[in-house]
């Protein structure tokens, strides 16, 4: 069982996934820093508050922390946009695979045409 596990881990897909998860976690930290240290203060200039995470409105004793939600939406949009750009860039760099023509048998029309040709040849004899 240990041998199977080693083979599983040694496969390229698992290693690629592990690297992707680690890079993704590091990238998330960078995006959160970008949002909280650069984007939120920029937005805060127009709203009059620098820290968006403290934006709250209350109805009775219920407090709706929409500022924290805005931070998460901004984080998501930035990450989604960067992933989009990365995929687009990778697709440009990667060689396009030529679609291999799969040879199948003749279509029904071709079979019928072949039979018609044979019948016509027999009639001419």
From Swiss-Prot:
Subcellular compartments: Cell membrane
Membrane topology qualifier: Multi-pass membrane protein
Keyword Isomerase in record: no
A single Gene Ontology CC term: plasma membrane
One Pfam family from the record: MscL
MF term (GO), any: mechanosensitive monoatomic ion channel activity
TM segment ranges: 19-39, 42-62, 67-87
PROSITE patterns per record: MSCL
Keywords: Cell membrane, Ion channel, Ion transport, Membrane, Transmembrane, Transmembrane helix, Transport
Family matches, as InterPro entries: Mechanosensitive_channel_CS, MS_channel, MSC/AndL, MscL_channel
Family, as annotated: Belongs to the MscL family.
Described function: Channel that opens in response to stretch forces in the membrane lipid bilayer. May participate in the regulation of osmotic pressure changes within the cell.
Name recorded for this polypeptide: Large-conductance mechanosensitive channel
Top-level taxonomy: Bacteria, Bacillati, Bacillota, Bacilli, Lactobacillales
């Amino acid at each position: 069982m240990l041998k199977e596990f080693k083979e599983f881990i040694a496969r390229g897909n698992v290693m690629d996934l592990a690297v992707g998860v680690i890079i993704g976690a590091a990238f998330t930290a960078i995006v959160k820093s970008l949002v909280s240290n650069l984007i939120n203060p920029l937005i805060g200039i127009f709203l009059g508050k620098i820290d968006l995470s403290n934006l709250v409105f209350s109805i009775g004793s219920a407090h709706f922390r929409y500022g924290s939600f805005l931070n998460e939406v901004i984080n998501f949009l930035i990450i989604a946009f960067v992933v989009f750009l990365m995929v687009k860039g990778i697709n440009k760099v990667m060689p396009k695979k030529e679609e291999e023509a799969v040879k199948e048998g003749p279509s029904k029309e071709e079979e019928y045409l072949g039979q018609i040709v044979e019948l016509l040849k027999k009639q001419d004899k």
